[in-house]
């Protein structure tokens, strides 16, 4: 499921909020509380949850459909329900509490949520999260999603080029979690080919088990909002194809 910018609203007309149990009063975006978002002509925008969309995702999972979600490209942290930041919110004129660390729809805790890895490595030689990628404990796996050659429509905002074998088709170099999540889908398809009876929970477990761990740059902090490369408490998991000759992996249900 790809909707990389998700449902959202802007950090405008702010009246106050609450960060980790402490109330605050202000009329502007508070970056020290993790209110980052992406800049648009109408102001800084962040993603929100849509109950009806999330319900549809849960129903698909309950029906046995395997769901992989692009985490989003809004620089925001996604926390889990038990996390310190899950209930952080702000209020704005004419609205109730707006929770900004819960990710954007489509979203489900049982789905596989994928973040984006940059094509350039960190100065220490580790992989690094793409600056714009969502992060935090709510992201399950990171996969390559920067400088990916992909097909695009003939009329879009990207600077497309011709596909050499057939110039009626267009290709473009794209980056984002919408490019990272298909990588996970591909490995997931291989795992399902090996064991087609895997449930969504089992496939998610298999994909997580096959990941490389601690290979991504991390500060070890969960609130260093000024560092756009920080995982902010995210799972340090990098996608690996378990069927590659470099790895040995056995599926057991």
Map each language-model feature to its residues.
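Hydrolase catalytic cores
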Residues: 6, 145-225
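Extracytoplasmic/secreted envelope proteins and their assembly/folding machinery
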Residues: 54-57, 64, 111-114, 129, ...
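Short clusters of hydrophobic/aromatic residues that line enzyme substrate/ligand-binding pockets
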Residues: 129-132, 148, 216, 239
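Extracellular/periplasmic catalytic domains that process cell-envelope and extracellular macromolecules
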Residues: 59-63, 104-108, 132-135, 142-143, ...
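Substrate-binding/access-modulating region of protease and related hydrolase catalytic domains
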Residues: 1-106, 157, 165-182, 194
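Short, well-ordered secondary-structure micro-motifs
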Residues: 13-14, 79-81, 124-133, 152
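C-terminal subdomain of the subtilisin-like protease fold in secreted/lumenal serine endopeptidases
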Residues: 1-5, 63, 111-113, 193-253
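Active-site-proximal beta-strand/loop segments in catalytic clefts of secreted hydrolases
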Residues: 3-7, 70-74, 114-119, 135-136, ...
């Amino acid at each position: 499921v790809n909707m990389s910018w998700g449902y959202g609203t802007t950090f405008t007309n702010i009246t106050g909020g609450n960060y980790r149990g402490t109330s605050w009063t202000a009329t502007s975006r508070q970056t020290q509380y993790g209110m980052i978002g992406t800049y648009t002509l109408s102001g800084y925008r962040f993603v929100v949850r849509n109950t009806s969309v999330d319900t549809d995702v849960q129903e698909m999972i309950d029906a046995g459909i395997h769901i992989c979600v692009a985490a989003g490209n809004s620089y925001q942290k996604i926390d889990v329900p038990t996390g310190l930041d899950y209930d952080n919110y702000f209020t704005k004129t004419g609205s109730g509490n707006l929770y900004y660390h819960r990710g954007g729809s489509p979203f489900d805790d049982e789905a596989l949520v994928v973040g984006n890895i940059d094509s350039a490595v960190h100065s220490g030689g580790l992989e690094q999260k793409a600056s714009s990628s969502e992060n935090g404990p709510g992201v399950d796996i990171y996969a390559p999603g920067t400088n990916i050659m992909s097909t695009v429509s003939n009329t879009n905002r990207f600077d497309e080029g011709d596909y050499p074998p057939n110039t009626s088709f267009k290709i473009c170099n794209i980056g984002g979690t919408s490019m990272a999540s298909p990588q996970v889908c591909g490995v997931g398809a291989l795992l399902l080919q090996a064991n087609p009876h895997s449930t969504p929970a089992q496939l998610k477990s298999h994909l997580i088990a096959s990941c490389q761990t601690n290979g991504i740059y991390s500060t070890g902090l969960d609130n260093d909002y000024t560092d756009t490369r920080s995982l902010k408490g995210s799972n340090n998991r990098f996608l690996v194809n378990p069927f590659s000759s470099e790895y040995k992996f056995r599926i057991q249900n």
